[in-house]
């Protein structure tokens, strides 16, 4: 074992370069290499190699993009069309709640903003009765030192949608008796497919923090007291916060998934994110590592869900970007090149849903969540087919 450790740590430049290439060009190879190496030499040695690879990537990107303006990835309405949108003035129809229109917030840092930063654009969806719009997208450049750092964010109307959690076929690993008996499909249930709006990745592997999960009223892995948790009630309302704030109503929750400490909670940035070199928000990789990340957030009313996936961000930039668009509480989900993604659905030629990446450049294997079983946990959104539910009080 000692020789194996020495060999792994001594791979140096070529090993780092190989890992960098693998995680950026072959979606399955990077995770496979990392998992195989962890089994041989342990997670600490692999973490150091991963951090070296991402440091190399960051240095290359900062040199390659020096002096460049940040990119916009889609067209946005011009200033006249945008007018004085507030997110609060969309008229209602009949007796339903007002139509959903998130508030445009503009750029976080004007010196690295692209055209349209912080402007919400509607996203079409496949779900039956797909009106009114329940999903919007925007782009934020959250790091004044990196013009290439970007967060793609969607906002979902929780009055007209419901969030669901699914355990992967492998992750998170179950430690309870009931969890070990639980039958995992790694798929979106057939009964929900006509109402599908979107799906996105879940949290860390069990070995990276042992963050808990409950799904279908079955606890797979017990909760950690200081972890952040996103949780669902039977009526479809959500809770998001440190487990201590969620635990008093734990018996009412049909599912929950934990993550590292809340990046933002009740509007306040975590004290550990005062510096861009924060060392948490990634057991395998430190929070200061510049890497692809994902996060989930709720606004102060509990009526708007935010999901973000990023390129080239540290934990602080991710948290501030999510907070800027309106998230009052934010939890980081998975990180690394191969895992974060947001998928939306359209009708295929057979009429069945077909998943497509909402944002280009991320990784997604065709038919995952529908026919291809997911080894990792994930979330999906469905459009409510009943009267829109009120915002939780």
Model-derived features: positions:
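Short acidic-glycine loop/turn motifs at beta-strand connectors
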Residues: 156-160, 232-237, 266, 298-302, ...
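Short, solvent-exposed loop/turn segments at the edges of secondary structure
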Residues: 149, 225, 291, 372-376
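Catalytic metal-binding/acid-base residues of hydrolase active sites
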Residues: 205, 336-338
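Aspartyl protease catalytic domain
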Residues: 165-324, 328
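Zymogen propeptides
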Residues: 2-221
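Active-site neighborhood of phospho(di)ester-bond hydrolases with catalytic His/Asp-centered motifs
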Residues: 330-333
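Short beta-strand scaffold segments in enzyme catalytic cores
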Residues: 152-155, 228-232, 294-298, 340-344, ...
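C-terminal regions of proteins
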Residues: 339-392
């Amino acid at each position: 074992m000692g020789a194996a450790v020495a060999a792994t740590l001594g791979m140096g430049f070529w090993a780092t370069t190989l890992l960098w290439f693998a995680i950026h060009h072959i979606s399955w190879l990077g995770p496979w290499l990392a998992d195989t190496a962890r089994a041989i030499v342990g997670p600490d040695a692999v973490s150091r190699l991963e951090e070296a690879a991402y440091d190399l990537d960051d240095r290359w990107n900062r040199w390659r993009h020096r002096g460049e303006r940040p990119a916009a990835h889609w067209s946005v309405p011009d200033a006249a069309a945008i007018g004085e949108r507030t997110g609060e003035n969309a008229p209602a129809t009949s007796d339903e709640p007002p139509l959903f229109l998130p508030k445009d917030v503009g750029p976080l840092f004007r010196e690295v903003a692209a055209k349209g930063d912080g402007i919400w654009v509607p996203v079409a969806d496949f779900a039956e009765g797909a009106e009114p719009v329940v999903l919007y997208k925007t782009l934020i450049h959250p790091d004044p030192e990196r013009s290439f750092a970007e967060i793609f964010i969607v906002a979902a109307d929780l009055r007209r949608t419901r969030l669901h959690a699914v355990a992967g076929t492998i992750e998170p690993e179950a430690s309870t008796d009931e969890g070990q008996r639980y039958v995992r499909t790694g798929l979106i249930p057939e009964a929900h497919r006509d109402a599908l709006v979107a799906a996105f990745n879940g949290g860390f592997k069990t070995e990276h923090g042992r963050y808990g999960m409950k799904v279908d009223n079955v606890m797979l892995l017990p909760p950690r007291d200081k972890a952040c948790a996103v949780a669902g009630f039977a009526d479809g309302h959500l809770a998001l916060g440190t487990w201590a704030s969620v635990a008093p109503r734990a018996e009412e929750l049909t599912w929950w998934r934990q993550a590292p400490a809340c990046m933002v909670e009740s509007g306040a940035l975590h004290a550990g994110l005062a510096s861009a070199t924060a060392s948490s928000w990634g057991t395998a990789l430190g929070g200061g590592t510049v890497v692809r990340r994902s996060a989930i957030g709720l606004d102060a009313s509990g009526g708007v869900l935010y999901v973000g996936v990023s390129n080239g961000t540290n934990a602080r930039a991710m948290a501030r970007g999510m907070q800027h668009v309106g998230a009052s509480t934010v939890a980081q989900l998975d990180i690394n090149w191969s895992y974060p993604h947001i998928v939306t659905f359209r009708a295929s030629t057979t009429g069945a849903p077909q998943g497509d990446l909402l944002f280009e450049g991320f990784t997604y294997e065709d038919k995952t969540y529908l026919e291809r079983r997911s080894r990792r946990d994930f979330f999906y959104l469905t459009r409510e087919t009943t009267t829109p539910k009120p915002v939780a009080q």
